[in-house]
Amino acid sequence: MEFGALLKKTLKENSVPVTRLSSDIGCTRVSLYSVFNGEKKLSEDTFKFILNTYDFSPLQASELKRLFYLENIGESQKELLFVLKDELETTGKIRPFLSLPLKEIAVCNEETTIVGSAEYYSAIAAFLENEALCKNNVIYTNYSFFDIQADNMLYDFAINNKGNDVLIKHTVRMGGDIDIKERLHNVFSSVKFAKLGHITNASTGGKKNFTFATYFIGAKTVIQYDNENECGFLTGEKAIVDAFRLAAMKNEKKKTVLTGFCESVLDLKEILTPLQKNMVSFLDFRFPANIFTTKKILSETVKDNVPYRDFVIEEFWNHLKKVQSSTPHGLFSQLGLQRFARDGIASDASPEFLHPISTENRIVLFKKYKESVVKNNYCLKIMNSDAVRVTEHFAIEIYKDGFSVLFCSEVNSKENFIGGCYIIYHDAELSKLFTDFEEYIVLSDGTLSKKYAELLIDDLIGQCESVINNG
């Protein structure tokens, strides 16, 4: 019996309700995302129950562990690293995808329909390994947003594929928004991308979904453009379009990747011409941090009225260089971007590859903060929540293993940043320094008055100087 069917049978026999399980094409992976009662997360107890109920092979168990911990990454980052380490010790390598016999792989032409996020790696693997399949083919897949290796695989293929224009489409679940679907269809019709097909996906009960997303333009540029509402990768569209156009103009000779997320796909048509003309650098505007591949573009983009602009540019550029040195091709996968946004770990690599800020640089950083507080009468806000809110122009957000600083030139009525720059530091020790001074938080919303902000910063500087003086 095929692996997915066996798992499905096991779940059924144990009265575990299954609402989605991709077992269509004999793949040795199975999607655990949204399997139980339509939930988006699978409890660890239920997951262990699955592993213990059926006698999986080591390879199957390893794949299940990978899927589970990827799809619950917010809670299980350390477990994920342990699983990958265990896999490395067991098999001798960490596989970015499974390489299965071609007869078990769903590879199709433009008129064919295939389904299932569980098959994503396998289809891509076979597709990339078979040169004959790399011409005039389309892979349709229900894209998994927690795949670590997918972006790098596609990037490698895009820059190495000699002259073949290949289109990979993935499903975009629009939540029944007819208006967005119609807008999508109009955009793709007008710009004449590939045919826009409906996908009948067995794992979604046969509902039709529109597709768009990862495009290989002349095997030189990858545009990964996601309007997946459920993942919340939405941000202001005008800045994105402007930035894409800027990148296209400024980086004519670059052979890199551009990634962008935007609320409205209507703006895609505004950026097509420069993108097809030039090879474009990697950008991300999904999160307040604007990540650029050249310091010049970063300098030209950070507005003049951003507080201590030069320091922001230099610090962010140094941060980006560390990220680029620890990730393949100097870019993030989608998972890497999610972790960057959520946890301050700005890399797909494990945290030990990112170095904390030196004590000397901490002092410089704190003195800059104090200068801003004193000169501009800024308040300072320390938060332990997930949401970033701004008081005046300046905010600090604390994480368990790091902290972030938001420099903002303007604040609107919803307390959202406008024209700001957001820097995240992975530094558990420094994060603890902040949390140790929670007694300075004198207002219920966490805002520090100017007086207490100065006291806090002075104490932090004093601690750093003490470390240096004590050797």
Explain the meaning of each model-derived region:
Residues 1-20:
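A short, Lys/Arg-rich alpha-helix, primarily the initiator
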Residues 26-42, 66-67:
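Recognition helix of helix-turn-helix/homeodomain-like DNA-binding domains
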Residues 109-466:
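Hydrophobic protein-protein interaction segments
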Residues 12, 23, 52:
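Alpha-helical residues within the helix-turn-helix
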Residues 20, 31, 60:
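Residues in the helix-turn-helix
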Residues 18, 29, 44-47:
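Helix-turn-helix DNA-binding elements, focusing on the entry/boundary residues of the two helices
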Residues 45-101:
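Short amphipathic recognition helices of helix-turn-helix/homeodomain-type DNA-binding modules
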